[in-house]
Structure formats: C-alpha cells, structure tokens
A protein has these predicted regions:
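Alpha-helical transmembrane segments of multi-pass small-molecule/ion transporters
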Residues: 1-310
Length: 310
C-alpha cells in the first residue's frame, strides 16, 4: 500500500505539472517554438547540472568501490533490456523507421520522477546511494545509446558520433572526477547547482503537458506495442530479473532496488531527445502516457510479488 500511495502522489504531481503545460499552450503563453526552448534549457543545462550534483552529493569514493555491484548489475540490466526491446520490436512488427525509438521508450524508465521516491521510501538509509550509483550508468547509457536510438535511422544520413559528446556525458565524467578525487563542491555553489538541477523535473513535465496539448493522444492509446511494453518489460521482466539476481551474493536491498527500477514506465526525457533529433516525439509521448497510467497498477502488483519471492 505504501508504494501505491507514493505512486498515486507522483501521478498527481505528474498530472498537475502537465496541466500547467496544457494551460500555458491553451492561453498562448507557450507554443511549439517556446516549448523547444524549454527542452533545450533542460537538455543543455538543468538536467546535466542535476546529474552532476546529485551524483556528487549521493556517492563518495568509498561507496563507489564498496557498492560496485550496483554498477555491474545496471550494465547487465541494460544489455538485457536492449535485447528484450529488440525482440519486442520484431514481435509487434514495429516499422523499421520506428524500431530504435520504440527501443528507447521501452528501455529507459522514469527513475527521477518515480524511482527515487519509491526506492528512498523503502530503503531510507541506502536508497539514495543505490539510485545515485545506478544513475551513473543509466545516464551514461541514455546520453550515448539513447541518443543513437532517438536519432532517425531512415533518413539516409549516418549517425554522427559527435552527438555522444554532450553536456550530460560531460556532467557524468566530471562527477566521477570529483568523486574519485574527493573534491568537495563549495557550499554556496552546491546550493545553487542543486536549485538549478531541481528545475529539471517540473520543466520536463510542463514541457510534456504542452506536447500532449499539441498532439492527438487518442492516436497512440490503442497501440498494442505500448501494452506489450507494459506486460513484458514492466511486469514479466522485473520478476525474472529479480529471480536471476537471486543466486548471486548481493544484498536483498540492491536486488529489490534494481528489479523495481526495471519496472518503471517510460522516462520523460526520451520525448525531448526524440524531438531534438527530429524523431517522432509524439510517439514517445504516447508511450509515456500509456505506461505511466498502467504503472499505477503494475508497480504495486510487481512489488507485492517481490515480497512473495523474497
């Protein structure tokens, strides 16, 4: 019930932020041009700042080495998810020009908006440490493989590797330098960066609300592949992944955290990446809508099953 309560609260916040975006578009305070300005601000500044400061504040060098298993499990998780989503794309006969985007919306979960409050409520002492360690690999994967997957593949142009060099990957590398070098961030600067980074989530949700307002969401509610993602990636896969980690000598807390993270709905940032790369951002937004609504039922159900399997 605790997870259900957290989920409903986060969904309520999700809806409020998006309604603000809808209202701003309806009243012509925002339009497609200004929405893209918000997207660039989040992608180029607030999100990289959030990645850097949350990682530096959440992990120290000793923790990085002592909890290295989280990093290894995260790598394994994304390898398996990449293979699974490729299989799902074949199973649901996704159009060739949409396969990569479908993989992106199915692979990357909404850790920042839903994962953090759920995991930290279950594990108040170490939850944020696990999330911070996970974020290192998660964001590195999003801003490298995720960039590749959200770049249209059917336009005849080869992928430009320079896209992998971006503010977010720079933030991750810089954070690792600070952690390994045990370099403290001065108090005032830390506070300023924390506040700048904190704008990422509400701005991303307001942006998403504006995108929803500019599209016909009914065109995407009936897409079977999104429900395939819900059933297979958000329900069956987390259970199998939880069982897969059982024989290994890792703590039950880490095992449960990683399995829960794999059950999360689509990450909101994927819409921004897709639109910035010229891909079908509305398709990504449709996935967010369907998977987020379904997660109200699937996440508590999966969590309950974890309790029986533990």
């Amino acid at each position: 019930m605790e997870i259900f309560s957290i989920l409903t609260e986060q969904i309520a916040l999700f809806v409020i932020y998006m309604l603000v975006g809808v209202l701003m578009v309806k009243t012509q305070v925002l339009n497609k041009t200004t929405l893209e300005t918000i997207s660039r601000f989040v992608i180029k500044l607030s999100m990289p700042v959030m990645i850097f400061i949350n990682t530096v504040n959440g992990v120290d060098r000793a923790t990085l080495f002592s909890s290295a298993s989280v990093l290894g499990i995260t790598v394994l998780l994304y390898v398996l998810l990449f293979l699974l989503t490729r299989l799902l794309a074949v199973l649901f006969r996704i159009r060739k020009d949409t396969v990569q985007l479908y993989q992106a919306v199915s692979m990357f979960g909404n850790v920042g908006f839903m994962g953090i409050p759920i995991v930290t409520s279950i594990f108040p002492e170490k939850g944020m440490v696990y999330i911070s360690l996970f974020t290192i690999i998660d964001q590195l994967t999003l801003w490298t493989l995720g960039i590749k997957l959200t770049t249209p593949s059917g336009n005849g142009e080869p992928f430009n590797p320079k896209k992998l060099i971006n503010p977010a990957t720079a933030a991750i590398i810089l954070a690792l330098i600070f952690i390994l070098g045990q370099i403290p961030v001065p108090g005032v600067l830390n506070q300023a960066l924390t506040k700048i980074g904190a704008t990422s989530t509400p701005l991303a949700m307001i942006y998403l609300g504006g995108v929803f307002c500019c599209m016909n969401i009914r065109d995407y509610i009936g897409k079977l592949e999104f429900y395939g993602t819900v059933l297979i990636k958000m329900v069956l896969f987390p259970i199998l992944f939880f069982c897969l980690l059982g024989p290994f000598s890792i703590s039950q807390d880490i095992r449960l955290t990683m399995a829960l993270i794999s059950a999360l709905p689509t990450m909101s940032s994927v819409v921004m990446l897709a639109k910035a790369s010229g891909a079908d951002g509305d398709y990504a937004a449709g996935s967010i809508f369907v998977t987020t609504i379904c997660s109200i039922i699937t996440l508590p159900a999966v969590s309950l099953l974890f309790g029986f399997l533990s």
